[in-house]
Amino acid sequence: MYKYLHILNDIENKIQNGDIKEGKKLPSIRSLVTQYECNKATVIRALHELEKRHIIYSVPQSGYYVVKKSENTIENNEIIDFASSAPDPDVFPYLDFQHCINKAIDTYKNDLFVYGTPKGLPSLIPVIQKQLANYQVFTKEENIFITSGVQQALAILTSIPFPNGNETVLIEQPTYHLYIDYLEINKVPVIGIKRTNEGIDLNELEQIFQTGKIKFFYTIPRYHHPLGISYSKDEKEKIALLAKKYNVFIVEDDYLADLETDSKADPLYSLDNCSHVIYLKSYSKIIFPGLRVGVAVIPPSIANAFYTYKKILDIDSPMISQAALEIYIKSGMFERHKNKIKSSYYNRSIKLAKTLEKVQNENPSLFTYNRQNTSGIHTCLEIQKNIVTETLIQKLGDIQISVDTIDKNYMRDFPKEKLLKLNVSNIKEDKIEEGIRKIIEEIKQLRQFNFQFRKE
């Protein structure tokens, strides 16, 4: 990363985290030169970029100051929202992406009026191919499909015939709730396999692969939704070997690949010979859900069927979004934004983990939390069986704390764990401990109430 981008990201994160307050003056250029061990021109370039993004402003003969946000923004942040998994709107560079949209309309204005690119915008595909290589996903252009989000890719994969001739889909429990809804509404044969902080039972997985007539296994190896855990390299290798042995396809949903902090954490796709693993990538968490652009890397054995169904279902995925994304990636803006949001979310995830460990040590019997080696934007707490979660959620809502259970992430008849989901993508770092302590206080009160009720 260029030095000025490092300085820019660092200052921006400090502003977002409240280390540098709104309306306050930044350190002098001379101080920043010393702090970041660089030359004056590099610091000035970073400051000019921040000024262009309306994050800071300059006062002649005085220095640079942090822009004050509107009162409405501050009011909206009063709710401490652990329930939402949407990206933080405050860290999205609206002006940058607006510029890319305008540029896309100017550049591709003729293409916007033409039907017939079901594989995706032709000029975007090689850009995506190059980007995927950074995630250790090496593939040919003809295997890359641009879809209207990962949900569309899942719908197509569920519908098309597979070479193994099987029809049953295997999913982790819990998993992505909208895919569960899709399977149930369309009456697709489905089997669930339990996933916990310890992973999945590989012996059970092999038994299901061997006898269950499985079409494909839908899995979220990295930063699992909603558990927040990741498979180890050993687990991924064993899953890939089992898939090949029993001719079962793997659908790998790598929706948080851009937030990975471990450079050695390669996707499951990289461990396969590209014949049994289908790789899905989303931009909804790193940019915004409304972009409606996803990427599917499809093996040659099902590429024609995927193309045909995609064309029938949706002639084009959003062309303006695709064109804007191409410009956003090629300009280097995507990489800069990725580094900024990854740093911001990483700091929040570490704050969440440390707070939960501290609070658990203070209240050892109140809830169960197992810190993972990986630090994602969400995790789960196991609460006592006698706590009525609906009551807890209602009481927390009354004091402006939003949380949720993971009940909807289970199939209807699958045994559910009593887990409380905590997501920090929409919470400022300095609000995390306050929110956690309020949650714990409400759990204490409900436990005390239950204890008194039993005594009476």
Provide a role label for each language-model segment.
Residues 1-104, 110-116, 124-130, 311-318, ...:
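N-terminal basic, amphipathic alpha-helical segments
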Residues 82, 250-251:
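Residue-level marker for buried hydrophobic side chains located in beta-strands
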Residues 112-246, 258-259, 263-271, 450-454:
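Conserved core of the PLP fold type I
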Residues 171, 251-252:
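Hydrophobic residues in beta-strands of the RecA-like P-loop NTPase core, especially within AAA+ ATPase
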Residues 278-362, 370-371:
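PLP-dependent aminotransferase class I/II
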Residues 283, 367-368, 407-411:
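Short, solvent-exposed loop/turn elements at beta->coil junctions and helix N-caps
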